[in-house]
Amino acid sequence: MSAESECPKRMEFGPCGGVRPDGQCEMRRGACIFESAVPWSGIQPAPQPVRAPLVLTDFSCTPFDRNDVAATAAILAPGCDAVLVGEHQNKPDFPPTLMGSLLLDAGVTPWVTLSCRDRNRVVLEQELRGLRSIGVETVLCVTGDGRGYDVRPDVTQTFDLDGPRLVSLAASVGVVAAVPETPTAPPLAARPIRLVEKQRAGASLAVLNHVPSPGMIGEFMEAAIAAGLSIPVIAAVAVFTDNVSAAVLQGLPGLELDETVTEQVLGADDPVAAGIGAAVSEAHALLKIDGVAGINVSGLASASGPHIGAEIKAEVGRRIRAEAS
């Protein structure tokens, strides 16, 4: 097989969520090699019966700072049921097991993202067993974004496994495997089916990436349920209150914001209040969709610093929980 016909992430069960809007690969020139979702061919365990958090809030703090982990967790805790720890290609932090331990000590329930980008299978197994041993129940299993060309070019990218195979590994060691899906990434018709294939691999929960409108999530969920989806789904709400926090979201692979809402928030007399209100309104609409069991409060939220952003996301979470009670 030629290099042009191989996935640079060595994926077997693609396509990943980083496919560009024009169908191009995120890591090299040329189209993604996957024209449709590859059916899962491995063991098909029954999904673990789990309850999705109503509010799952993105967690971001100063890297490698134990004190800031605790401080940020204290801000977020009153407005969420769990926190989602990302793993960004340009922002390394403590190893997953250590981060999970710090967050448990801080009194929050962590969902830890585990990526195949920087770990071979042995290290992935170590992290999964380590997380399970300290009491972290849920791991978001991702293939991982490709590292930017100017981000540590001296470091290799591993990709021993892809997301679905990591899901299978996680389920085999007793970890609750959560998975992402990007409804707006090509090929669009394959995305609901690919989520079902992840369920067959052992996923028990799903987190959907941002889309421009709740109606798009409704269409996605209808197609996914028709294809056999039965696991709880958490839909993302974009939280932004200034140009920088909006731009960060729009710069992520496969992520789109509603242009009208973005203009209304950024042009408001009080962008913070407008951003919070827009996020809560979107969450309310998403929770009415069949199969959506929770909300991922996501985004930088503010360019004024991580603690200000955490306070904004905590307020969004508090309002979502108050309206749902």
What do the predicted segments below correspond to?
Residues 45-82, 93:
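Conserved N-terminal beta1-alpha1 strand-loop-helix module at the mouth
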Residues 53-60, 81-85, 110-114, 139-141, ...:
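Hydrophobic faces of well-ordered beta-strands that scaffold small-molecule active sites
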Residues 5, 86-88, 116, 180, ...:
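Glycine- and other small-residue-rich loops at beta-strand/loop junctions that grip anionic moieties
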Residues 62-76, 96, 121-129, 187-197, ...:
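Short, acidic/polar
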Residues 66-67, 89-103, 119-127, 145-169, ...:
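Active-site-adjacent beta->alpha loops and helix N-cap segments on the catalytic face
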Residues 61-63, 144, 154-184, 226-282, ...:
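Active-site pocket-lining/capping segments in soluble small-molecule metabolic enzymes
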Residues 49, 73-78, 97-109, 128-136, ...:
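Acidic (Asp/Glu)-rich catalytic clusters
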Residues 1-45:
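Cysteine-cluster motifs in flexible loop/terminal segments that predominantly coordinate metals
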